[in-house]
Structures are given as C-alpha cells and as structure tokens.
C-alpha cells in the first residue's frame, strides 16, 4: 500500500471519527434538552402551587397571571392550618397509615415466606390465582366492599379504612421474589439445626430482604396518605376524615366561593411530607423493587 493510500485512509478514519463525535454530541444535546423540557413540565405545577399559595385572592384572580406574587402572604399557611383543621387530619391519616402498614407487613411477610419456602399442595396454583387477581381493576371491588362494610356496621370507623386494604397481592409477589433469591441451602441448614420457620424468617430472611420491606412500607404509607375515593365513601365525618377529604371541603364559603391561595397553601403543607419521604428514601424504593425483579 502506497503512502498516498495510507494518508487517504487516515483522513477517512478521521472524517468518520468526526462524524461520530458530532452525532454523539447531537444525541447528547437532544437528550439533555428533552430531559430539561420534561423536568420543567413536571416541576411547573409544583412551582405554580407554591407561588399561588403566597398570593392574595385578588392577585390570584387576575386575568394576566403573575409568575411571582407582588406581596408575599405567609399568613395563608397559618390560615390553611387552622381552617382545614390540619392537625386532626394529619393525626387521622397517620393513624390509619401506620396501623394499616404494620398489619399489612405482617400479612405480606408471612404470605411471601409461605409461597417462597414452604411446600404444600396447590401452592403454585394458589399463587397463580392470586397473581391473576392483579389484572382485575380495584374499582370493581368498591361496591362489594362498601356493602360488606355497611353490613358489618363499620361505617364511619377507622376499621373501614384499614381492613379492606390489608392484603396486597403485589406486595406479596414483590417480597416473595426477594425471598426466592435467598439460597434454599440456608433454610435446609437451619432446619437441620432445629430452627423453627418463624425464627429463620426473623433472623435470616427479614434482614436480607430489608430494602424490599422498606420499599413496601413507604409505598403503603404513600397509598394511605393519597387515598381519596374510599375514605370519602365510608368515613367522611369530621372525626374520621382523611387529609385528602378534609382539604376538599375546607376552603369553600357559604356562597360557594373558594379561597384558592389558602387552599394551595394547605395542599403544599400536605404534599411536603410525601416529597421529603421520596427525596430521602427514594434509593430504598428503587433498591427494593430492583432486588425483587432479578429472579422469578
């Protein structure tokens, strides 16, 4: 091969390399622009909620909206807390969330352990039927659950908010998949040493599956915090109102006029705990879900 051919070959390689660099750079720029646009679309409603909560009602109703309040009204937050009785709503929601989460964890752990380690007739068939129920929309159970709660006399009680949602097939499946990753040899060795199933579950499996359990706890608490339809149906009295239902009716006067800035302030207060939980514990959520999806 002549020197001229070598030079042309090097030039072609350089040209291809430059083109690849340009294409890769263009892809990166497009990717970052796309992510930036998506981030703005997602974050803008939260930004609008915050600035709206700092305005007065007259400025909020301006035909040309302002993107920052001319005068900051921090008093909206104090008014929101007292008007909506947020203290009681927080306590009610926390009580339902904590109790339902603890009971749900007990049921989920025992069920997942049974399907992952114990051997009994019809185990796979039963687990398959449970998974099949995940394809049924939860809304279909609303009427039957309501009738059952009414017949049991649980209307307007915390029991009606807790019991119907103690069992989650998705959480059982999630934890069972995590338990399946733990070598069965550990279980057999423990049985040889005379360890009971409950002791093995408590000493070995639960510590190893802790990230998934934390994920389930967070998701369950968030579900209780955001619940609206069911509490509205079965426990909408003042003594048992959840935080989402309390906000719905707290800021409308006798003329039907809603004080939107104060309502936005209340929504910001209610959203803050969930935002902080996700901000500081998101790694546990992702870790628990990813660990449960490795082995089927």
Predicted features and spans:
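A structural signal for multi-pass alpha-helical bundles of membrane permease subunits
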Residues: 19-23, 27-296
């Amino acid at each position: 091969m002549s020197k001229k051919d070598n030079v042309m070959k090097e030039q072609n390689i350089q040209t291809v390399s430059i083109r690849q660099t340009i294409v890769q750079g263009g892809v990166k720029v497009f990717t970052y622009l796309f992510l930036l646009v998506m981030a703005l679309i997602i974050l803008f409603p939260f930004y609008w909620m915050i600035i709206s909560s700092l305005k007065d009602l007259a400025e909020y109703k301006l035909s040309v909206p302002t993107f920052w309040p001319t005068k900051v009204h921090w008093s909206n937050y104090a008014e929101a807390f007292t008007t909506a009785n947020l203290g009681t709503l927080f306590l009610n929601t926390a009580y339902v969330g904590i109790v339902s989460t603890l009971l749900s964890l007990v049921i989920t752990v025992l069920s997942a352990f049974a399907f992952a380690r114990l051997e009994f007739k019809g185990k796979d068939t039963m687990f398959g039927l449970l998974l099949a129920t995940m394809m049924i929309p939860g809304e279909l159970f609303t009427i039957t659950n309501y009738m059952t709660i009414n017949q049991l006399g649980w209307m307007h009680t915390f029991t009606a908010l807790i019991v119907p949602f103690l069992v989650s097939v998705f959480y059982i499946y999630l934890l069972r998949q995590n338990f399946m990753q733990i070598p069965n040899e550990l279980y057999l060795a423990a049985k040889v040493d005379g360890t009971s199933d409950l002791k093995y579950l408590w000493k070995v499996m639960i510590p190893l599956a802790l990230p998934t359990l934390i994920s389930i706890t967070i998701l369950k608490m968030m579900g209780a915090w955001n619940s609206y339809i069911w509490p509205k149906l079965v426990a909408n009295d003042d003594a048992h109102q959840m935080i989402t239902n309390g906000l719905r009716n707290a800021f409308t006067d006798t003329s039907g006029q809603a004080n939107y800035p104060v309502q936005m302030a209340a929504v910001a207060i209610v959203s803050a705990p969930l935002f902080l939980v996700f901000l500081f514990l998101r790694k546990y959520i992702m870790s628990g879900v990813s660990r449960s999806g490795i082995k089927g």
